[in-house]
Amino acid sequence: MQPIQRALISVSDKTGLLDFARVLAARGVEILSTGGTARLLADNGLTVVEVSDHTGFPEMMDGRVKTLHPRIHGGILGRRGLDDAVMTEHGIPPIDLVVVNLYPFEQTVANPDCDLETAIENIDIGGPTLLRAAAKNHASVTVVVDAADYERVAEEIQSSGGVSEATRFDLAAKVFEHTARYDGAIANYLSARAESEAGASFPRTLTLQFKRRQSMRYGENPHQNAAFYVEHQVAEAGISTATQIQGKELSYNNIADTDAALECVKQFDEAPACVIVKHANPCGVAFGATLLEAYDRAYQTDPESAFGGIIAFNRELDAETAHAIVERQFVEVIIAPRVSDAARAAVASKPNVRLLECGDWSREPGDRLDFKRVNGGLLVQDADLRLTDQIRTVTERTPTEAELADLLFTWRVAKFVKSNAIVYGRERMTIGVGAGQMSRVNSARIAAIKAEHAGLTVAGSVMASDAFFPFRDGIDQAAAAGIKAVIQPGGSMRDAEVIAAANEHGMAMVFTGMRHFRH
């Protein structure tokens, strides 16, 4: 193992740097540095050689040119035992450790007020060059791009004076992952800007990078391998930010279903709400005066399907609700923004139940993209975050205030049901859910069947449809079940026929002007 004798340190994020640099100084490592990093180290009593003194060439062009010099890159790229003679001939001392992180380009362009000039000035040139050079020559050079690695590198240096081959290789791979992401972010930004000026909504090339959070026993089915990857900077509370408090390891299906349940319940903030999901579809959703009441009412919609389901809440999980769940049913996952200590103790009686806490979320989620893999390609779209374009009554009868509240409730639920989606509801509780049918009228039939099977009365309820009714048969079916009001996007060639059917049955019907297909 080759000892670390000389290090180059130049960082934008100085988290943890002083402690790491002190370890190097204590081992007698010579430290080369630039600009603000050099000042920080010197101000804290560490001996530093400015890169400009090392190269005999000043920093220039407002810091654009600092480390781009043969005496720096030769010291990094020189192969020990192979290039020693040429390094000696040209007076190039070897550099054994490179510690660099980059200008914060992604954080800069995330600011809506960022202009092109500011973005350009936050494109790091020297940093990626140093990192890539050191990573390429990892056989001789240790490279650190992540402050989280300072501790393990410091421990190896303190114990042996150098860094093991396995660690150097891992750190080198990490560098290329990091620079790939960095260059991808720049390419995405500039390409999107160029395409926007040309009238396009998306960049002509799209570079994405996710970090592996978890390797899984298997995927959707036991014969499929799987892993869970997350964004580097998750902007909003969700399944990717969740902390598992107890329970078995989350499976592929657990994560997919928990995401569906949580994203659905996040729509509701005006009262305690509960969403129960099975196979990515809500099988019960309800409001309540308390969290326990919300759970009880959601469970009533479809107790049979709730078995082995995922339960999500929009309020802190309390002990009373937690006790009710574990005493009543088998549940795979419970997730809430927060979980009280008493609720944790209650769920602990069922050690296999996966209990998650995701943190509070914003009532105004930021824009994001949705992706769907197809063979040989990727479908990209804006996430479906809006609810309605407008609410317009199209029938002779206007919905009552109570009906309108239920219509808007079921409309929010229908948005998360697989198409064709029909949701029956009353008093802000789902009565029946018809999901994933090829025929919309069959979804309506299934919603009525589910309600009857659960012992719930459809008469006097309302209905939401995620897309327009192509024929009047869906309205006739709903009327036969006792539905009194309907919410749907409208836009069918036969809207007049559908409206006439609603009028014949004395129904109120509103159009939203916005479809919510979910595939």
UniProtKB/Swiss-Prot annotation:
Residues 1-145 form the MGS-like domain. Pfam families: AICARFT_IMPCHas, MGS. GO terms for cellular component: cytosol. Transmembrane segments: none annotated. PROSITE patterns: MGS. GO terms for biological process: 'de novo' IMP biosynthetic process. Pathway: Purine metabolism; IMP biosynthesis via de novo pathway; 5-formamido-1-(5-phospho-D-ribosyl)imidazole-4-carboxamide from 5-amino-1-(5-phospho-D-ribosyl)imidazole-4-carboxamide (10-formyl THF route): step 1/1; Purine metabolism; IMP biosynthesis via de novo pathway; IMP from 5-formamido-1-(5-phospho-D-ribosyl)imidazole-4-carboxamide: step 1/1. It catalyses: (6R)-10-formyltetrahydrofolate + 5-amino-1-(5-phospho-beta-D-ribosyl)imidazole-4-carboxamide = 5-formamido-1-(5-phospho-D-ribosyl)imidazole-4-carboxamide + (6S)-5,6,7,8-tetrahydrofolate; IMP + H2O = 5-formamido-1-(5-phospho-D-ribosyl)imidazole-4-carboxamide. Its EC number is 2.1.2.3, 3.5.4.10. Keywords: Hydrolase, Multifunctional enzyme, Purine biosynthesis, Transferase. One of its GO terms (molecular function) is IMP cyclohydrolase activity. HAMAP family: PurH (MF_00139). Belongs to the PurH family. The IMP cyclohydrolase activity resides in the N-terminal region. This is Bifunctional purine biosynthesis protein PurH. It comes from Allochromatium vinosum (strain ATCC 17899 / DSM 180 / NBRC 103801 / NCIMB 10441 / D).
